[in-house]
């Protein structure tokens, strides 16, 4: 019936209303693109507690988003079978029982609750001067070759390169025509983070960020800075030099992605989330029932063909 979220740790006195959250939910609302689910949800948030007379009280903030267009009947043909790429099998193995009407806690619909809570954290961090830029770095085999922050808002795929966005759209059309889906890479840049946040061992900043991003269901890998590319570099190529000017120490490059030794170094924090293709595709796939019978399954219903848009927003908010 609804998606909920509870946010702990927000200090008292932050100006907050439902519209502050709603603007973020509008950006990930279903049905805004040919490549996302056709499900129509208003995604209207209600603040149930933790705010009084437009200010946070310091107590937990409870949020509610009501579902208005759920169709449980769409899942009737998978009630007793395991969908490839989904968590149906592992849910059954862990709990011995599952609700087959969607993915439950592994559903993309869970994004709404995370985004609503993250919107509050974004507002708090913005008051400290910390800002975020998130975009699709690649969709399928199509990668960006240029960067325009304005262009991110000009296309449905949130790519900062208009030419790449056009090519990615053509690629997604091919996926649609073949009843398939696409993965991609989301990049997030966090600016104005002071040096020294994090810890040296158990609470490393990069480990904390990776833990948060990997909690998003579609994410299969996280990179920080140059990521896996550092394996191809020499030490002299990978090391970020330091320079002092007017009493301020900064780096000459940012291969480390703003984090060294588990702590922020004052430069931009750069991370990438690798998103798997949406597993709900209409092609016939081999699977089994919960009683062990082999069968060919065709998944019906309203599903994303690409999750980069809403996962990108979720990545930004999980970095809060």
Where on the chain are the PLM-derived regions?
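Generic N-terminal targeting/processing segments that precede catalytic cores or assembly contacts
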Residues: 1-313, 320
């Amino acid at each position: 019936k609804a998606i909920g979220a509870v946010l702990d740790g927000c200090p008292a006195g932050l100006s907050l209303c439902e519209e502050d959250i709603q603007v973020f939910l509008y950006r990930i609302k279903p049905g805004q693109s040919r490549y996302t689910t056709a499900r129509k949800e208003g995604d209207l948030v209600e603040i149930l507690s933790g705010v009084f007379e437009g200010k946070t009280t310091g107590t937990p903030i409870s949020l509610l988003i009501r579902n208005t267009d759920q169709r449980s009947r769409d899942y009737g043909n998978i009630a007793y079978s395991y969908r490839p790429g989904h968590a149906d099998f592992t849910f059954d193995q862990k709990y011995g029982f599952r609700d087959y009407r969607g993915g439950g806690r592994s559903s993309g619909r869970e994004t709404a609750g995370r985004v609503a809570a993250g919107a509050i954290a974004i507002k708090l961090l913005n008051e400290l001067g910390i800002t975020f830029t998130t975009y699709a770095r690649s969709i399928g085999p199509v990668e960006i070759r240029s960067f325009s922050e304005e262009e991110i808002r000009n296309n449905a795929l949130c790519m900062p390169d208009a030419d790449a966005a056009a090519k990615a759209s053509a690629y997604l059309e091919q996926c649609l025509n073949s009843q398939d889906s696409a993965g991609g890479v989301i990049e997030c840049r966090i600016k104005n983070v002071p040096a020294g946040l994090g810890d040296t061992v158990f609470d490393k900043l990069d480990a904390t960020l990776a833990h948060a991003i990997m909690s998003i269901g579609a994410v299969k890998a996280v990179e920080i800075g140059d990521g896996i590319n550092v394996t191809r570099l020499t030490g002299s190529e990978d090391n970020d030099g330091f320079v002092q000017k007017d009493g301020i120490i900064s780096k000459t490059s940012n291969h480390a992605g703003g984090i060294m030794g588990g702590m922020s170094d004052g430069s931009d924090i750069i991370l990438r989330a690798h998103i798997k293709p949406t597993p709900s595709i209409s092609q016939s796939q081999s699977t089994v029932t919960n009683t062990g019978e082999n069968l060919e399954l065709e998944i019906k219903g309203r599903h994303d063909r690409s999750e980069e848009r809403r996962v990108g927003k979720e990545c930004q908010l999980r970095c809060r």
